[in-house]
């Protein structure tokens, strides 16, 4: 923590209490987004660990923080869920990260006006669930719907699922409120929205928004395959020309289909939790439309498909792709890293753009794209989200990364542009945003933020990173062959432990995309509200540890231990990582093998289990005191049977009625069973989850012997 932040600590603690953190670990976890900066470039960004992280819970608190920060010249970096890779949420000037996690309320839903008013930190999925209760739904949403925030999408700018019909997100915003550096609050609507949309918090901290929504209707999904990019272009142009009532158009390229087929499926202790659906190695287009329009679509689609050399795929594939539309990052497990490259190109040049990219980039390039019928210039546009599988642990990652600049340069050649500005492409702001918008942003920024405290170095800033990106763009002729010569290795390949982290867990730590799907639904996180308590926070910390920048301490050991093992993170994970199983493996490593301290009450439980066979410190001689006397002769330990009723510690010592009710039900059902009485010991599951695996094993062996 800097000396300046040290002087401000008392103010922040008195104002925000438990909603401000100065913890080294916490601050580090709020100093990055989903992208991994190559090691050769990282020095240009310098230290991005903020001095503090603050979580305001109201617009009033946000305004007070902004006014204080301006008076004290403290930089403020707003953070929704940091699901972008453009660096917009990275605190390049340190200062304070403003985490909007607690500003997550749905303020008002207007069914008649078809609008919703929300705080900026509300997650799309949460909002959609609230809308559904009133027969409404979102007009469009990002592919990061399970984790990203409404305010973050306005600040970043974007298009997503539903954008074929609804366009860019900004055009679906009625109004937005933002806090200015002087602590005042201004409402933006109409053309004025351009002063905060895509500005990434550089001109104001978005606090509240009103967006347009639509009636909730049944949707139908169709999947079409096309052999090449020009056929895809022809198909989509025909959809537009025929005015088919389509709500959303998504598509993937053949390499994405290939890698999805190779990607590991979700498992639960060796058993697959999902069916295997094999995709054809082709472009796969997913059309989504309202059920009431199905007849019109069905009448015209076959002719359009045939003219584009396409083929309608099975309903199984269509439903599988729609169900997994948020699991784009499953291919990251094969990397375990991805080099991102996101651009926007006109539909009319899409085929040529893709053909040129395939010629210039020989690395495996996976793409998922969204078609916008009415783009920013009134013409159809395609948002192309591309990834190159790579491995950030290898030095060669530094050579693969510049290929993203090649893709951006080719996009510009065909009338396109980078998707966003952020930290890396602020030097291309005029291409991304347009000259007139950049001029207005500069004027407004100069007027309201003369001290430059709001998200410095982004969008229209001129930092070292932006300068380096522009410079590198002039040397693509040199960087391109170097990146293409790197040998691409695809597939999970854990090779051995890294420091003391098991090989598979080490691989998963890098395979985690930091998408944040696991965060809000995590029991451990929502009881505390800080990144270190989330699965993605732990994965990132493990990377830092394996690279020698962090060391284990009791706080981090405790963070691994307090997971409730509910496994909801496994179900939410966009890469289908075995998260809970990894934490269990680390518990055994940290506690059983390295003899670190577990949660103190478990030490007492372990002692009681070894001595008396139970976690409640009851005497073994009293273990069977609960058993009904009238059933002792019929089902007691002297009665031989192939079936044993295992009561366990809690039923034996604490909640006797559980055991009593169970044995009476079994007896009434004429089930023959026996009971071990004092020979029975604890199930030892508490010893398993707290990492004391030696006690778990000894107790299990004792139970097996008793049977």
Regions found by a protein language model. Name each.
Residues 25-27, 31-103, 138:
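Glycine-rich N-terminal segment of FAD-binding domains in flavoprotein oxidoreductases
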Residues 478-504, 533-554, 660:
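Short, charged low-complexity linear segments at domain edges
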Residues 88-104, 132-136, 159-170, 209-216, ...:
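A glycine- and small-aliphatic-rich helix-loop capping segment at beta-alpha/alpha-beta transitions
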Residues 105-252, 453-454:
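FAD-binding subdomain of flavoenzyme oxidoreductases
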Residues 506-509, 539-707:
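Iron-sulfur-cluster electron-transfer modules
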Residues 424-493:
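Activity-critical C-terminal alpha-helical subdomain
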Residues 1-28:
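A charged N-terminal "starter" segment
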Residues 22-39, 233-406, 410, 421-422:
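C-terminal substrate-recognition/cap domain of FAD-linked oxidoreductases
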């Amino acid at each position: 923590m800097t000396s300046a932040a040290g002087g401000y600590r008392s103010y922040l603690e008195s104002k925000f209490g438990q909603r401000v953190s100065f913890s080294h670990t916490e601050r580090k976890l709020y100093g990055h987004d989903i992208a991994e900066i190559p090691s050769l470039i990282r020095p240009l960004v310098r230290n991005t660990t903020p001095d503090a992280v603050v979580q305001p819970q109201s617009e009033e608190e946000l305004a007070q923080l902004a006014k204080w920060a301006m008076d004290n010249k403290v930089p403020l970096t707003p953070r929704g869920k940091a699901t972008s890779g453009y660096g917009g949420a990275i605190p390049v000037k340190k200062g304070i990260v403003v985490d909007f996690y607690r500003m997550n309320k749905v303020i008002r839903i207007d069914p008649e006006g078809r609008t919703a008013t929300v705080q900026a930190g509300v997650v799309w999925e949460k909002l959609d669930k609230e809308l559904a209760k009133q027969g409404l739904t979102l007009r469009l949403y990002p592919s990061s719907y399970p984790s990203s925030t409404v305010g973050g999408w306005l600040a970043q700018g974007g298009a997503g699922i539903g954008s074929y019909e609804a366009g860019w997100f900004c055009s679906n915003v009625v109004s937005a409120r933002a806090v200015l550096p002087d602590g005042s609050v201004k409402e933006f609507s109409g053309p004025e929205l351009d002063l905060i949309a895509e500005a990434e918090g550089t001109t104001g901290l978005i606090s509240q928004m009103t967006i347009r929504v639509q009636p909730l209707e049944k949707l139908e999904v169709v999947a079409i395959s096309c052999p090449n990019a020009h056929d895809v272009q022809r198909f989509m142009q025909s959809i537009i020309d025929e005015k088919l009532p389509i709500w959303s158009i998504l598509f993937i390229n053949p390499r994405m289909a290939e890698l999805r087929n190779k990607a590991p499926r979700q498992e639960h202790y060796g058993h697959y939790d999902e069916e295997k659906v094999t995709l054809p190695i082709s472009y796969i287009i997913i059309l989504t439309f309202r059920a009431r329009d199905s007849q019109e679509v069905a009448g015209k689609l076959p002719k359009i498909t045939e003219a584009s050399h396409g083929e309608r795929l099975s309903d199984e594939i269509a439903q599988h792709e729609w169900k997994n539309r948020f699991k784009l990052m499953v291919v990251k497990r094969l990397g375990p890293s991805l080099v991102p490259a996101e651009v926007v190109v006109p539909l009319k040049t899409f085929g040529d753009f893709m053909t040129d990219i395939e010629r210039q980039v020989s690395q495996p390039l996976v793409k998922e794209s969204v078609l916008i019928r009415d783009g920013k210039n009134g013409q159809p546009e395609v948002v192309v989200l591309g990834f190159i599988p790579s491995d950030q642990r290898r030095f060669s990652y530094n050579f693969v990364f510049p290929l993203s600049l090649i893709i951006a340069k080719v996009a510009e050649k065909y009338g396109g542009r980078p998707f966003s500005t952020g930290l890396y492409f602020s030097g291309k702001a005029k291409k991304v945003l347009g000259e007139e918008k950049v001029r207005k942003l500069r004027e407004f920024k100069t007027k309201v933020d003369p001290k430059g405290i709001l998200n410095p170095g982004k969008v229209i800033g001129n930092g070292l990173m932006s300068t380096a990106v522009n410079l590198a763009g002039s040397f693509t002729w040199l960087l391109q062959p170097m990146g293409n010569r790197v040998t691409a290795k695809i597939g999970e390949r854990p090779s051995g432990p890294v420091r003391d982290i098991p090989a598979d867990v080490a691989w998963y730590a890098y395979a985690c995309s930091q998408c944040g799907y696991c965060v809000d639904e995590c029991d451990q996180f929502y009881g505390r509200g800080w990144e270190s308590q989330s699965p993605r926070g732990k994965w990132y910390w493990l990377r830092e540890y394996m690279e020698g920048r962090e060391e284990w301490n009791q706080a981090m050991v405790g963070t691994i231990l307090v997971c409730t093992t509910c496994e909801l993170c496994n179900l939410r994970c966009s890469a289908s990582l075995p998260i809970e199983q990894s934490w269990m493996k680390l518990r055994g490593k940290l506690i059983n093998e390295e003899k670190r301290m577990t949660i103190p009450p478990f030490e007492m439980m372990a002692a009681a289990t070894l001595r008396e066979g139970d976690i409640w410190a009851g005497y073994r001689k009293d273990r069977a005191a609960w058993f009904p006397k009238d059933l002792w002769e019929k089902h007691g330990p002297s009665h031989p049977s192939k079936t044993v009723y295992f009561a366990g510690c809690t039923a034996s010592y604490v909640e006797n009625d559980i055991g009593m009710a169970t044995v009476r039900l079994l007896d009434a059902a004429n089930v023959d069973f026996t009971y071990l009485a004092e020979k029975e010991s604890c199930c030892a599951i508490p010893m398993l989850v707290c990492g004391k695996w030696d006690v778990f094993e000894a107790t299990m062996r004792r139970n097996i012997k008793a049977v």
